[in-house]
From Swiss-Prot:
GO terms for cellular component: cytosolic large ribosomal subunit. It comes from the Bacteria. Pfam families: Ribosomal_L30. It comes from Aromatoleum aromaticum (strain DSM 19018 / LMG 30748 / EbN1) (Azoarcus sp. (strain EbN1)). Keywords: Ribonucleoprotein, Ribosomal protein. This is Large ribosomal subunit protein uL30. One of its GO terms (molecular function) is structural constituent of ribosome. InterPro entries: Ribo_uL30_ferredoxin-like_sf, Ribosomal_uL30_bac-type, Ribosomal_uL30_ferredoxin-like.
Amino acid sequence: MSEKTIKVTLVKSVIGTKQSHRATVRGLGLRRTNHCVELQDTPEIRGMVNKVSYLLKCEG
């Protein structure tokens, strides 16, 4: 059985954002602009993505 995943890409820089938002982006495993990661689709990850959605592009 395959786990559901979501593909998250950082499309805007974290410069000038709140410290907590920068920490959330790092917690998602994103390091630089246009960096993409695949993450498990869990409520915790969805909450983190929702918090910094203005910086991200999400697929899946």
